[in-house]
Each structure stands twice: as C-alpha cells, then as structure tokens.
Amino acid sequence: MPNYDLPNPAPEPLRGVQLFVNSIDREHDREWLPGWLEEHGLPQSEFDRAAALREALRALLYVHNVGGAAPEASAYVNEAARAVRVELRGEEVVLAGADPLGEVIAVALTAMLDGTWKRLKVCRNCQWAFYDTSKNRSGSWCSMQLCGNRLKTRAYRTRRRGAAA
C-alpha cells in the first residue's frame, strides 16, 4: 500500500477501516489489497474474501453519501460478522482469535454503535473513503483540493456554456 496522508482521516481505530476500503484506487486503477494482506499477515489466498468485504463496506459507505440502501452489502457484512468472536475480559470487550479482516468488521460494528460510522463516506466522484468532519454531516467529496475543485470547475464551465448559448 502506498504511504500517504489521507485528506480527511477518520479517528482511530476507524482509520484502519478507511485505509482498508482505500486499498484500491479506482481512479488510477491501482490495486493495493495484496500489500494490505501481506502487511497484516494474511496469505494471498484471502484476496477474494478481503476484496468482497472491502466492496461491501464501500457500498455501505457510499449510501452514507447519497442515501438509499445497500441490502446485499449489509447482508454480506452481517454474514461475515457472525464469524467474529468477542470475549469479556474484566470490563473490556476484546476480539477472540480474530484475523485482521475480523478486526475490520469489529471496528466497523463498534463505529456503528458509537455514531462515528455515518461520518465515514465514499466520495461521489472518485470512490475514495473519507471522514466527514462537517458539522451537519453534509460532506460529499474526499477533499476540496481534489474532487471538490474538479466538480466545482466542471459545474462552472457548464454554467458558462449555458450562459453563452
């Protein structure tokens, strides 16, 4: 995976889910999931399972941005979550023998409970996961410098063409 700073990083540990979802760059057709698997000690034979989870999470995050529902993605994550075991150790809930994909699921489920999940979204333009820091949760771009600027420039040009006609 590339060494990069996310324009709008999620707080830890949700940032790990954000990095996992961003293990593909659709705009430049780059696949970083094999590196993610290696970095987290998983064999390459887990690629299909990891890619399916990543795309299910991406679909759920896209809904945060555009509305609607993603029933197939929800069903996939629910099924994958059944394999994640937690234990109570004293006052703390911990994962019991979960692999890194199980940890991604557990963090996502925890974020759903603590309210941070709905702030993690997928950019309408480039499909990059970003954390919405706006007060009213209305952010729709990964960053103003990247997609926001592109889309505003495109809209401006469209308006100018319409006014000139």
What are these regions (language model features)?
Residues D132-T133, T153:
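Short, non-ligating residues that shape and space the ligands of small metal-coordination modules
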Residues T133-S134, Q145:
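Short beta->alpha connector loops at strand-helix junctions that form conserved
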Residues L120, G139, M144, R150:
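Residues immediately within or flanking Cys/His clusters that coordinate Zn2+
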Residues C126-Q127, N136-C142:
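Cys/His-rich short segments
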Residues M1-Y131, A165:
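Short helix-coil boundary/hinge micro-motifs
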Residues Q145-A164:
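Basic DNA-binding region of bZIP-type proteins
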